[in-house]
Structure formats: structure tokens, C-alpha cells
Amino acid sequence: MIMSEYRHIELSDPNLERDHLRLLTFGSPALKRRGDVTLFLPPEVETLLNVPLVILLHGVYGSHWSWTFSGGAHLTARKLIAEGRLRPVVIAMPSDGLWGDGSGYVTHASADYEKWIMEDVAGCVTELVPALSARSPLFLSGLSMGGYGALRLGAKYAGRVSGISAHSSVTHLHQLKSFVDDSPDADAICNSADELNVLYWMKLHRETLPPLRFDCGMGDLLIEENRQLHQALNEMQIPHTYQEFPGGHTWEYWQKHLTDTLLFFESIC
């Protein structure tokens, strides 16, 4: 057990870990309770400094293990590193804070799920991993609700984030009603409903927005929302890359196109 400004930190035993995955639980000031993170720590980072930190956000119903044991994110990253196509990176895959079926990664009355990601996860992981520092590039990505989180938080904290990539994204919090009974928009705390729209933050911070890409499957129920975001960004002349591929709102799609995200981040470094 390690004492830290994040209260009690529990890490899995390296002797029992597999596939370069490490499990982390710590007391989060933003959540006011414990939070969970799965880490991918390739062996190459042990001798490196200031390596990139990639935060992958999951969708509704999921948790910190979703990107690994449903999406094989660590296997994709390991393959790309071994092929020399991706430099060694640390990947942090946090839970969304476990509010209802999905917190939306926004501030609620009971807990701040936005600060959980941007302050606690990024801060605690950087504190624990010697290869990371304040100079490490920070990249955000996610799928569905996690795509919304990556787009919104990446745009809101544009000065801190080096790149954004999202898959099959919810583009406004109210769209989660298509997936869950209790949408987090009713519990969200913000100055105006506009702040729950990813486009609001992209427009507000257009001058400092980091490199941005997003994609969606042509058979995805969110395809029209993603096309509308693409069109709106074009009309505002905000640089971005938007791609459509065959596929739906499935792990098969996200497993395949995580490669696009990681190679996009590599191109920025």
C-alpha cells in the first residue's frame, strides 16, 4: 500500500500480472470514493522518460477492464510497438466512475466525473509511472460515451491535450437516452446546456484545439450525429479528420479501428 495525495493507492502485484497489464485502485478526490484504472505498461517504458500517456474511455455499461478484455487494446498496442509503428506508450483505461449505466464523464451533483479523468487519473498515473512526467504528451480517445468524453474533454482542456481521437461517438450528452434509462444529463452540473455539446467547446477553443480525428461505422446508429458534427466543423473551418468505415456499434469495429487512433497519436509525437 502506497501513501499519496490521492489517499490510499493499491496496485496489483507485478509477479501476478499478465500481458503488461497493471490494475490500480485509489481514493479519488473528485469521486469522493475509490476509482479503478487498468494500465498497459510495455516493458520498453522502464528505461524511457516523458513517454506519451493515452487515456482510453469506455462506453455505457462498461468499466476499466472493457478496453482490454472486450477490446484487446493492450494487444493492439503491443503489436504496433513490436512492429516499430508505435513508440512505447502508457495506456490508462479508467472506469467512468460507475454512475448508473454511464456517467458521461461530466460533473454531477454527487461527484465530478470530469475531474476524475483529467485530474485524478492523469495525475495519479503520472505520479506512479516513472516514465511519465508533466512533459509527457496526453492523448484522449474513447468509444461511444467514451468518444463523447474524449471529444468534449479534449476540446475543453485543449491546452493540456496533445491529440483527440474518437470512435462511434455520442456528440451531445442527451443522445445517451438512446442507450440507457437514466441519462446523466439530468444530473449534470453546468452553466448552460450548451456545455454538454462537444461542438460548444470546439468552437470556444478553436484556436488551441489539438489535432482531432473521429470515425464512425456506416451501420452505426450514431452515424448521422457524427456526420452532423463533421459538417458543423467544416462550416466553422475547424481542422479535423473524419472517416467512415463498414461496421456498426460493436467491439469488432472498435478493436479494428483502435489502430487508427494509436497511429494518429504516433503521427503527432
Report residues per predicted region.
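Non-catalytic cap/lid and distal C-terminal segments of serine-dependent acyl enzymes
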Residues: 1-269
